[in-house]
Amino acid sequence: MSSFNLSVDVNQNGNIKNVDSLSTLDDIDDIDFAKLLEKPRPLNIDRLRSLDERSLTELTGSPQLRNADNASRAPDHADYVISPSFGRRSGFNTPRSQPGFESHPMVGEAWDALRRSMVYFRGQPVGTIAAVDNSEEKLNYDQVFVRDFVPSALAFLMNGEPDIVKNFLLKTLRLQSWEKKIDRFQLGEGVMPASFKVFHDPVRNHETLIADFGESAIGRVAPVDSGFWWIILLRAYTKSTGDSSLADMPECQKGIRLILSLCLSEGFDTFPTLLCADGCCMIDRRMGVYGYPIEIQALFFMALRCALLLLKHDGEGKEMVEQIVKRLHALSYHMRSYFWLDLKQLNDIYRYKTEEYSHTAVNKFNVIPDSLPEWVFDFMPPHGGFFIGNVSPARMDFRWFALGNCIAILSSLATPEQSTAIMDLIESRWEELVGEMPLKVCYPAIESHEWRIVTGCDPKNTRWSYHNGGSWPVLLWLLTAACIKTGRPQIARRAIEVAEARLHKDHWPEYYDGKVGRYVGKQSRKNQTWSVAGYLVAKMMLEDPSHVGMVCLEEDKQMKPVMRRSNSWTC
């Protein structure tokens, strides 16, 4: 167990007794960013290049790298402009809007709901519970989930309240060092918990944390995404506050290395992607995403790029940086080459030869053209494209997965052209992907015989419900960030207006059912925290686009692959 701790008073009744600021914030004058939204264009302010813009080649060769790293945490680029709210402790007040920005009445209600979800450990806020729904059995919805807390954390950072995020990062890091066993098998040292809860012993008047590393999850699957989200959030905290001291702590440096050591170890893999089991990410039940799911690959890519900015380049850190650089080059080429689908690529796959041998093969995964689903030919617009769900030997999952594609844009796994194509697809297929509630977690739903085979007759993942084509409001923040990065804020504004028509009235459901997301999910929890936080983050990003810098990385020009095709191509 880690030796560092946060010493505070014990909280006996769930209400905060004493919250001391963990850092001093300097007052910064208000800046009006409303004009940034007047024209749908990419944020592109010429400033000194930040570390995010530097190529991977430069990263490994520069002796001044650590100084550049620290400099990148200062406000020197459009992907990080200090938020007007940063430096103002809002306490428990709803943040005021920037001049010219009309706040929707439900913003205040959303902040109240987010405050009610806060969890305290020994007097300090350490996260937000998954849902505040007393009408249903709690199950594990009263826990703090790593992936669920990310939009909450971003909301607090954007509102100038970094303490809860810092506490969360430290507490989950401490949990990482715990011994992790499922039955008689010990998990890897770097595995981060899926969730944790605070247990209060009234006899001893003492609080402890109880973590779940997958031993209590559906299917008993370890959360592959938790570690990646932790690294991404650490970088967001560093960018937002300009404080690198947390990331520079030996414990945090070790935590990053342990997480990535699980992913960068050598084995039998012939691909740079990560092999995963079903249920290892947001889609936490059997849904046919085993293999190399786009969500994990995109998060892996973004976590690697964030780690490159956070790791110290000396000793163990330098060796890992070299591994990261090599993996990023291979991963970006693989994903952009084999996961990308547009009209031309779809037509090419339709005409694939099969049973090709040797290094000249074009159909490297031996995908049978007859296995292409009929729906994808109608779904693909003339101008548009997306990263498909999965690619493995003799198998391509052509489903659209929102989270993976949005993260691909934010991390610059997608090239600028691919990012534009993804946004074109969303606009062209608005009714299918947004409908009456943004955003479809995947499209289309699987049904009938395929549903029985793929899900094992899962009653929660029936067609157009939950993860099987359900609509998830939390994805609104990812869509908004992607829209702003690609210079298409009008798409986000339209999606937010759609959500505002129902979210508050329906009491912030976890997800919606139906082909267009018309119905509150049959097992959906009300007052779902990340639905609340996702809306708030989306609104604040539109209000101040500079906030996107917390979760946005610029393209590295060195990673753009040269596409070549061999003579075995069918003409």
Swiss-Prot record:
Enzyme class: hydrolase
Record EC number: 3.2.1.26
Keyword field contains Hydrolase: yes
Disulfide bonds: none
Assigned keywords, A-Z: Carbohydrate metabolism, Glycosidase, Hydrolase, Phosphoprotein
GO function term, MF aspect, one: endo-alpha-N-acetylgalactosaminidase activity
Keyword Acetylation attributed: no
Catalytic activity line of the entry: Hydrolysis of terminal non-reducing beta-D-fructofuranoside residues in beta-D-fructofuranosides
Record InterPro entries: 6-hairpin_glycosidase_sf, 6hp_glycosidase-like_sf, Glyco_hydro_100
Signal peptide annotation: none
Annotated positions of the Phosphothreonine modification: 94
Source domain of life: Eukaryota
GO term, biological process aspect, one: carbohydrate metabolic process
Modified residues (Phosphoserine): 21, 55, 83, 85, 568
Protein family membership: Belongs to the glycosyl hydrolase 100 family.
Protein task: Invertase that cleaves sucrose into glucose and fructose.
UniProt-recorded name of the protein: Probable alkaline/neutral invertase B
Gene that encodes it: INVB
